[in-house]
Amino acid sequence: YLHSFLNERCVTYSKHISKPEESRKSCSRISPYLTYGNVSMKQVYQATVKAAQEATYKRPLHFFTARLHWHCHFIQKFESECRMEFENLNRGFDVIRTEVNEEYLKAWKNGITGVPLIDACMRCVTQTGYLNFRMRSMLASFLTHHLWQPWQAGATHLAKQFLDYEPGIHYSQFQMQSGTTGINTVRIYNPYKQGRDQDPAGVFIKRWVPELADVSSDDVHAPHEMPALFAQM
């Protein structure tokens, strides 16, 4: 995976990193191997630096190197504040989102919320163990902002789906997306806009939500907005 990424697939890394379908080929896909220690961060970093020196496509490799820096940063941060697995980093948020709506949570976990991209992402990660970064962030944001559920209610479930589960990255990112760090900008992803931006033809959605396979690309992102006549056809 590392060899094919550095020599071929990385060319479209920067362009496709946020797209749920294309990222499956354009991202490195080495995260599970880093998680389980099959390859070390030092090996990956040194190989990337060497490839960047020799390649004509330097920009995507520099972009990837920055992500490696982030990886190390968040793991080190977790070592310093391991309580973030259970507690809000900013305790001022302890008084909000205290109740769990089991119906909402079940729909989110099973990919049956009725929001196409959300459901496609959850079904995909449940079956394959992989999802690109932006879509992971969107799942966390949707749970905590749109469904208004405490992040703790969904963090463990999502962690169990990942082949590359890394506590240091997972919990810090989940808190960032839920807005409980107290220092990061609150991120609220519009799942309909994300679908149109990152999966415009609806390829990813139709693959994982076959119920929408026959819906046009124009309507697949928000089928609830279809005129009643077309929805019945």
Regions found by a protein language model. Give the residues of each.
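Long hydrophobic alpha-helical segments that form multi-pass transmembrane helix bundles
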Residues: 1-13
